[in-house]
Amino acid sequence: PFTAYLRAYCEAAWETETRTLRLDSTTLPLGRAETSSKEYLPFPALLGGVLTAAEAESGPFQVLLPSTQGAEADGQYPWGVETVLERQGLCRVKVIAPELETLPERCPEPDLLFRAFLVGDLLLCAPPEQRDALAPAGVPGWAELETLAAHIGAIPPEGRTLGIVGEPFTLFTLHDGVPDTLEQEGWRLLRAPLSEYLWFLWRDAGSSACREWAGRVEVLGHSRLGRSE
């Protein structure tokens, strides 16, 4: 549920058209053909998605691939993709790799960005069959987020509970439909909030914006926790 809202953020903040990278079984072989070792599955899938986009687009375009200041593998994906693009002579494709740790200080409208993550997390707390109906048309304001959190929090939980953790690409795309199948079978899936992870990341990086968001996030949490567990 994050994609639509993050695209809306990018289009509003940079006044540019956005498209979603294709990541599936057809793009994976393209990425694997360019790798020589046992990389984590998300990297060849992501690389294949970029190469597929390069085949479909004849003109120049940019690919947004966030990086990190740490040494973890997924924070280094942009540099690997850039190397392959250079080797194939695809200089018209530019990789934009902002550091996650400094996003609130360096990106335009950080409040809008944070709300884009929050609404995705809230929708994941709703029953899967109600998510489309509950999804706001655009990135909601704080008052709308509070209303949405209270509404979702009032929905009685049903089904057996299962917590799922993992790398984001695997959780939301490269999973062969397993989470969807589990939800159809009545399992209630719980995921760690992406917005919470980013809030702690930004707080530890010294972001001043996190102090402004703390109270608002607490209100959302109380609204959400109104739902009996």
What residues fall within each predicted segment?
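An N-terminal assembly and electron-transfer interface module characteristic of large anaerobic redox
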Residues: 1-229
